[in-house]
């Protein structure tokens, strides 16, 4: 069983060029379509072991040739103007086949006119192409103000004396089914592009047609890939190290928080429970073993009473050396008071010695001026160290007056 189906494909830029030429013209436009027709047979085997062959024809519209003057290659009756037709298609190569023609009409319906049908039949006979297609494009105003127009297009193909519409697909970059490799021939290349490529071909291509710089570019690409792999490995290692450091930092923060919380709890406990004077407790047990009242007394190191009695043993090794007498330097407050007293006494003693040295000098001067025979004058000036300055001066005056008195 065999079947046939036909579809048409037109690239987006070809369709855009067609519409641009039409919308920038003040009247109807027409021209020819160039491209190729490819047939592909698909054989599918069914469960009944019968071959089902389907032939798919694809019309690839690759280029258009506009006629800048309406009805240039035909007359009113639809007869062809052969010389003008040859001029229009003279610049086209043999590889570029004429697969159809097109026409734009303003403010009309999507229906082929009788003259278009006759013209299409004459073109089929002249071009010897029974599969010639006709692309009809019409534009109609979509609003009452005619500010927006609606463009309609349809591809017509004659079959058994009737024109049937062929599905036309406008390929676009956004279409997912157009991302693969094309099995059809490429678009028609312009003459200017061919001339430019031939002129500069030797600069970029070898004699065998391969690019001259492909090997260098491939080597550079390989080197870049190696460098990229090294950089990626270094990046992975650095990310791992950063992750480990972050984990260590978080662990340290957690430990610090736990330690801080523990210190706060222990600090509160210490502040709530003052430290006991263990030595005093053991001394009371040693010297008053029969007194329950003294053994139940608990004092802190600061001298404050602890409400709860002590029943535990403190396990002090030097229990025999304990005594109830406390040395003065063992008490910090007493040691501070004693140091203050010693400092004040040293200052007072210094002032006293200075005054005594001055008084001794005065006494020496008076003793030199007076009579040295008397026993009282030979007596040195001695102080016990407890006399005041007034007592010393009084004794000095008494000695001086005694030395000046006459002796009988």
From Swiss-Prot:
InterPro entries assigned: BRISC_Abraxas1, FAM175, MPN
Residue ranges, annotated region (Disordered): 360-408
Compartmental location: Nucleus
PROSITE patterns in alphabetical order: MPN (PS50249)
Recorded GO MF terms: polyubiquitin modification-dependent protein binding
Domain of life: Eukaryota
Protein name: BRCA1-A complex subunit Abraxas 1
Species of provenance: Xenopus tropicalis (Western clawed frog)
Gene it is expressed from: abraxas1
């Amino acid at each position: 069983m065999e079947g046939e189906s036909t579809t048409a494909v037109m690239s987006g830029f070809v369709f855009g060029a067609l519409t641009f030429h039409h919308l920038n013209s003040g009247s109807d436009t027409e021209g020819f379509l160039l491209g190729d027709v490819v047939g592909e047979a698909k054989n599918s085997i069914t469960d009944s072991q019968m071959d089902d062959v389907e032939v798919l024809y694809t019309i690839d519209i690759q280029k258009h040739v506009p006629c800048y003057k309406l009805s240039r290659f035909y007359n009113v009756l639809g007869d062809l103007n052969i010389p003008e037709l040859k001029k229009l298609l003279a610049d086209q190569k043999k590889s570029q086949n004429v697969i159809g023609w097109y026409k734009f009409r303003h403010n009309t319906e999507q229906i082929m006119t009788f003259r278009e049908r006759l013209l299409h039949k004459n073109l089929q006979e002249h071009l010897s192409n029974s599969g010639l297609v006709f692309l009809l494009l019409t534009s109609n105003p979509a609003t009452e103000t005619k500010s927006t127009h609606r463009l309609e297009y349809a591809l017509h193909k004659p079959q058994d004396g009737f024109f049937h519409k062929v599905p036309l697909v406008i390929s676009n970059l956004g279409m997912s089914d157009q991302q693969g490799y094309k099995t059809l021939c490429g678009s028609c290349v312009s003459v200017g592009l061919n001339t430019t490529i031939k002129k500069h071909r030797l600069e970029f291509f070898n004699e065998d047609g391969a690019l001259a710089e492909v090997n260098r570019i491939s080597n550079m690409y390989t080197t870049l890939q190696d460098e990229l792999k090294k950089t990626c490995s270094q990046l992975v290692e650095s990310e791992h190290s950063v992750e480990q450091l972050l984990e260590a930092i978080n662990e340290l923060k957690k430990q610090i928080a736990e330690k801080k919380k523990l210190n706060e709890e222990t600090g509160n406990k210490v502040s709530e429970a003052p430290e006991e004077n263990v030595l005093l407790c053991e001394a009371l047990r040693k010297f008053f073993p029969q007194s329950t009242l003294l053994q139940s007394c608990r004092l802190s190191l600061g001298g404050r009473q602890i409400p709860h009695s002590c029943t535990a043993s403190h396990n002090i090794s030097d229990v025999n050396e304990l005594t109830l007498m406390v040395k003065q330097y063992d008490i910090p407050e007493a040691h501070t008071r004693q140091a203050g007293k010693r400092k004040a006494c040293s200052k007072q003693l210094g002032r006293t010695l200075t005054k005594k040295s001055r008084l001794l000098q005065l006494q020496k001067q008076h003793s030199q001026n007076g009579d040295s025979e008397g026993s009282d004058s030979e007596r040195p000036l001695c102080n016990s160290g407890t006399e005041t300055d007034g007592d010393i001066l009084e004794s000095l005056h008494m000695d001086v007056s005694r030395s000046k008195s006459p002796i009988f």
